[in-house]
């Protein structure tokens, strides 16, 4: 099944030529799209959902392309979830699947799991569609066990009945709405649809996220997580400074006695490192009690990778940092996967570290240059993080583009690496499922706390 799905993303001319052409289009179908992923947080600052999309390129929005292109793109998006691989997301998070009217009718929807999958219908202003047919289809999907998400504007678009069966109601782009208007809309929707959960989109700052929390909104999507602004007078916590000192000591080849001594400056950190080495994932036959022995067993490279993750830990639980860590893990694993076959193992490890450290400015709430000044990093790593240049930059930029950019940008970056949508999407899905499983293991074992 997975191989069949991945076949949808091959870009060979022979496959394109063999596809039937829709009657309303006389040109070649669009190239297979790249999968985009965006995090959605809840009121507890935890990653509650992912939104998956394969948007229609702007250049293909002419009338002759609209219906058939949207149908094709929706088909690709739906077939991602037919795959057992991406279906793993539904074991751990909600997944929002935005569809057009044509996508709502796709026969493969019947094969999708109902648990944690949200079918979303939120047409843009002025969109034309058969309201009677769409409402009938939404009711049928609801009755078959799917959760539904609908745009609040459907009430003004002649489809208020859809909101009555929706578990989620999207408020749209909240950055374009004044606080009084947004608050009034939230109160109205909460009164009319008390069982529904409201979703805010395109939140671009932590301040807007916090303001939306006060308005009774339940789910939050936007770049606020990875684009937290620098805070005046921001200081690095003592615990994190010990981690940074350890990272720098590893890079200057300090011996293991010195590394253990640095770690014991914070007993909590030393305990976490011992707990990591003795965890089931390491497969030890006998427990290791001495920190130096544990460090020798793990080795410098693996210890360095683990310590970069411990930067996201704190003395008391911080769900926002945990959410940021999961995002960093996806970036890191995707950058590493993209570099596979193109770089030797040591450089792939550094590509992983580049992905982790790409959010250190948001984590420490200070400019990237100031944050990186604390670390002794290889020049190529610093160059990628500060200037998006050097050998690691293309892998980092493509990993970030898969969560933030449009199709044209993702394709341009993929072309630089000689990769098509099939290859990038495959690695993206693998990185996401790995990151979620890894985050879950951290939380269950308390290793990341």
Where are these regions (language model features)?
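C-di-GMP signaling machinery
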Residues: 1-32, 60-84, 228-256, 265, ...
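Bacterial c-di-GMP phosphodiesterase EAL domain
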Residues: 10, 16-115, 123-126, 133, ...
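Acidic active-site catalytic centers that drive phospho-/nucleotidyl reactions
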Residues: 42, 151-152, 266
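Soluble or luminal CAZymes and related metallo-dependent hydrolases
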Residues: 73, 181, 327
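Hydrophobic, Leu/Ile/Phe/Ala-enriched alpha-helical segments that form helix-helix packing faces
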Residues: 76-85, 138-142, 189-193, 339
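A conditional alpha-helix N-cap/helix-loop micro-motif detector
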Residues: 100-101, 131, 179, 252
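The catalytic core of metal-dependent phosphodiesterases that act on cyclic dinucleotides
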Residues: 111-226, 347-350
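Conserved alpha-helical "signature site"
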Residues: 186-187, 194-196, 201-449
């Amino acid at each position: 099944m997975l191989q069949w799905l991945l076949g949808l993303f091959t870009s060979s001319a022979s496959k394109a030529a063999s596809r039937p052409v829709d009657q309303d289009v006389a040109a070649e179908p669009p190239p297979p799209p790249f999968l985009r992923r965006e995090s959605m947080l809840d009121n507890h600052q935890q990653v509650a959902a992912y939104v998956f999309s394969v948007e229609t390129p702007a250049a293909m929005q002419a009338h002759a392309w609209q219906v058939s292109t949207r149908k094709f793109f929706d088909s690709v998006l739906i077939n991602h979830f037919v795959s057992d691989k991406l279906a793993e997301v539904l074991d751990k998070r909600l997944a929002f699947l935005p569809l057009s009217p044509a996508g709502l009718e796709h026969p493969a929807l019947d094969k999708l799991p109902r648990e944690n999958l949200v079918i979303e219908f939120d047409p843009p202003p002025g969109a034309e569609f058969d309201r009677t047919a769409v409402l009938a289809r939404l009711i049928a999907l609801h009755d078959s066990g799917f959760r539904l998400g609908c745009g609040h504007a459907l009430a003004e678009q002649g489809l208020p009945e859809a909101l009555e069966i929706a578990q989620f109601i999207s408020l749209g782009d909240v950055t374009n709405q004044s606080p009084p208007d947004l608050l009034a809309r939230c109160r109205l929707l909460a009164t009319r649809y008390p069982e529904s959960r409201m979703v805010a989109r395109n939140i671009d700052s932590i301040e807007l996220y916090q303001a939306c929390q006060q308005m009774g909104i339940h789910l939050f999507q936007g770049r606020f997580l990875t684009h937290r602004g620098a805070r005046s007078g921001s200081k690095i916590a003592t615990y994190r400074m010990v981690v940074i000192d350890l990272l720098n000591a590893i890079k200057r080849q300090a011996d293991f006695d010195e590394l253990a001594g640095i770690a014991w400056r914070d007993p909590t950190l030393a305990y976490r490192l011992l707990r990591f080495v003795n965890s089931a994932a390491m497969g030890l036959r006998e427990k290791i009690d001495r920190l130096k022995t544990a460090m020798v067993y793990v080795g410098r490279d693996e210890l360095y990778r683990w310590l970069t993750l411990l930067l996201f830990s704190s003395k008391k639980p911080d769900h926002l940092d945990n959410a940021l860590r999961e995002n960093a893990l996806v970036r890191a694993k995707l950058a590493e996967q993209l570099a596979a076959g193109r770089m030797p193992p040591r450089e792939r490890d550094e590509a992983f570290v580049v992905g982790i450290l790409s959010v250190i400015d948001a984590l420490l709430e200070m400019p990237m240059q100031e944050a990186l000044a604390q670390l002794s990093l290889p020049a190529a790593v610093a160059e990628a993080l500060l200037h998006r240049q050097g050998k690691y930059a293309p892998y980092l930029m493509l990993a970030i583009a898969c969560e933030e950019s449009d199709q044209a940008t993702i394709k341009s970056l993929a072309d630089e690496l000689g990769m098509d949508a099939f290859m990038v999407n495959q690695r993206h899905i693998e990185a996401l499922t790995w990151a979620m499983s890894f985050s879950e293991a951290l939380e269950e074992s308390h290793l990341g706390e």
